[in-house]
UniProtKB/Swiss-Prot annotation:
Listed name of the protein: NADH-quinone oxidoreductase subunit C
Main localization (coarse): membrane
Subcellular location: Cell inner membrane
Enzyme superclass (EC): translocase
GO cellular component, one term: plasma membrane
Record-linked SUPFAM superfamilies: Nqo5-like
Family of the protein in this entry: Belongs to the complex I 30 kDa subunit family.
Keywords attached to this entry: Cell inner membrane, Cell membrane, Membrane, NAD, Quinone, Translocase, Transport, Ubiquinone
Subunit structure: NDH-1 is composed of 14 different subunits. Subunits NuoB, C, D, E, F, and G constitute the peripheral sector of the complex.
Pfam families tied to this protein: Complex1_30kDa
SS bond list: none
Phylogenetic classification of the source organism: Bacteria, Pseudomonadati, Pseudomonadota, Betaproteobacteria, Burkholderiales
Catalytic activity: a quinone + NADH + 5 H(+)(in) = a quinol + NAD(+) + 4 H(+)(out)
């Protein structure tokens, strides 16, 4: 008798065929990778196929692979990773799609398939700059509307570009260039034989 994950894998391969770029198992969960051009079609099949029935999108996030594997990674930079749940069959699936263009990452929106994707896609847009084509209201959700850049990208500076402060003369919040100076932090080594001024 096949295990639940083997049954799911067989059902996915039968339903999706050549649209599967890769299907891997790790830590008891399957990860399905598809092309951006097949993303909506695959998502609809995952939801509607009677042998799959992924009724719920439970999470969606962006990923920046710029420094993945200590810089040895040589694939597309940005991906949207979706976690799906089938309540009917009691199984989960991770669905990954890579944006074909690193300079302007665009993937289709899943809002018309699972409306729970709405705010998740807005968050991935806000933090990574991934554009979800067809999203009904793609605007920032966590950062300020005037925020410059996307703070979860690997090339975004830790200190940011600007800082905000309240200006009592103007009686409003103003932006100004970051005043934090870059510094190198060197850890202080405390030797056991001189710890706390005690000599052993």
């Amino acid at each position: 008798m096949a295990s639940k994950i083997e049954t799911l894998k067989a059902n996915l391969e039968a339903a999706l065929g050549a649209r599967v770029v890769s299907l891997t198992e790790a830590i008891g969960e399957l990860t399905l990778v598809v092309k951006a051009s097949d993303y909506l079609d695959v998502a609809t099949t995952l939801r509607d196929d009677p042998k799959l029935r992924f009724e719920q999108l439970i999470d969606l996030c962006g990923v920046d692979y710029q420094t993945y594997g200590d810089g040895a990674y040589d694939g597309p930079r940005f991906a949207a990773v979706t976690h799906l749940l089938s309540v009917t069959n009691n199984w989960r699936l991770r669905l990954r799609v890579f944006a074909p263009d690193d300079d302007l990452p665009i993937v289709p929106s899943l809002v018309d398939i699972w409306n729970s994707a709405n705010w998740y896609e807005r968050e991935a847009f806000d933090l990574y700059g991934i554009v979800f084509e067809g999203h009904p209201d793609l605007r920032r959700i966590l950062t300020d509307y005037g925020f410059i850049g996307h703070p979860f990208r690997k090339d975004f500076p830790v200190s940011g570009y600007v800082e905000m402060r309240y200006d009592p003369e103007e009686k409003r919040v103003v932006y100004q260039p970051v005043t934090i100076e870059p510094r190198e932090i060197t850890p202080r080594v405390i030797r056991e034989d001189r710890y706390g001024g005690l000599k052993h």
